């Protein structure tokens, strides 16, 4: 029997230390030098040790969680020049981290949260973990796992913008108007908002888990339809982007559903949302 509440707090600490408080600069430094890896390990250990403030946890368990994370990351650092691809290293790395936290929750007896946290609803912690999971970690995983599809979509976009710019310039030259001053290479930066796609994906996953919690699976189809309508023009004109869009959308929804089922059916099996009792209309029975 696993210790569900302990796993939730350890998993939250893992998400915070491995994703939210690991900026891109530190991630790059971690790949280039061992000092960056040590700095990341110290930040991660800080969040793991903070679990003691929330759950009555022995110190040795928190130290084991911190040291095991450092060992796994060190092995990944040594394998960075191997034949394993970045997506494969990322999957193995996160799987081992998750497995370690799960084993620690199994090997420890049931532990209670601190008394000052009793004012919060029991479902607060799995919901907090779920939101943390489907936000930045999934965005990072999309960038790593589907990097080649994203690059193909970007190259396709640049080619389309260049062709459009050339057509516009040719039309202006024919009309004897030399008003086109913006280089074609700058057009993609003017036409796209940086980070908008990541926010769309995050909101999509949050809405998905809300629909799943309420049993409204049909509403997920409407969500996908609305998202597809917003991107219809680019999907219809760019096969590379269409593939990347479809893969990213299906992956995003799949992760949201699996994350919800894992946290609420396996780790912390409680009813997250109480659905109202359906109203049944009945005809009055005739009087005797």
Model region roles, listed by residue range:
Residues 1-4, 51-61, 212-219:
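Transmembrane helix interruption/hinge and helix-loop junction motifs
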Residues 46-54, 103-108:
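Membrane-interfacial alpha-helical segments at the cytosolic side of multi-pass membrane proteins
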Residues 48-70, 77:
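Transmembrane helix-loop-helix
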Residues 60-65, 88, 221-225:
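Hydrophobic alpha-helical membrane segments of integral membrane proteins
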């Amino acid at each position: 029997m696993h210790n569900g509440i302990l796993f939730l707090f350890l998993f939250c600490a893992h998400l915070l230390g491995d994703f939210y408080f690991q900026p891109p600069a530190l991630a790059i430094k971690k790949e280039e030098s061992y000092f960056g890896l040590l700095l990341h390990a110290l930040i991660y250990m800080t969040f793991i040790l903070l679990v003691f403030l929330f759950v009555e946890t022995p110190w040795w368990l928190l130290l084991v969680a911190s040291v095991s994370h450092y060992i796994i990351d060190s092995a990944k650092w040594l394998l960075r020049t191997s034949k394993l691809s970045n997506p494969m290293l990322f999957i193995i790395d996160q799987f081992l981290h998750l497995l370690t936290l799960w084993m620690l929750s199994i090997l420890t007896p049931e532990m209670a949260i601190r008394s000052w946290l009793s004012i919060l609803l029991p479902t607060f912690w799995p919901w907090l973990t779920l939101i943390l999971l489907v936000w930045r970690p999934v965005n990072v995983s999309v960038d790593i796992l589907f990097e080649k599809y994203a690059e193909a979509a970007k190259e396709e976009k640049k080619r389309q913008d260049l062709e459009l710019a050339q057509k516009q310039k040719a039309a202006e030259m024919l009309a004897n108007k030399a008003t086109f001053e913006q280089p074609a290479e700058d057009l993609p930066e003017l036409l796209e908002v940086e980070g908008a796609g990541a926010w769309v994906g995050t909101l999509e996953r949050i809405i998905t888990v809300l629909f799943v919690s309420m049993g409204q699976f049909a509403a997920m189809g409407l969500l996908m339809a609305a998202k597809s309508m917003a991107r219809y023009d680019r999907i219809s004109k760019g096969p590379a982007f269409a593939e990347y869009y479809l893969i990213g959308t299906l992956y995003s929804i799949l992760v949201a559903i699996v994350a919800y089922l894992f946290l609420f059916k396996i780790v912390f099996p409680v009813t997250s949302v109480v659905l109202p009792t359906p109203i049944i209309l009945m005809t009055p029975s005739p009087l005797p």
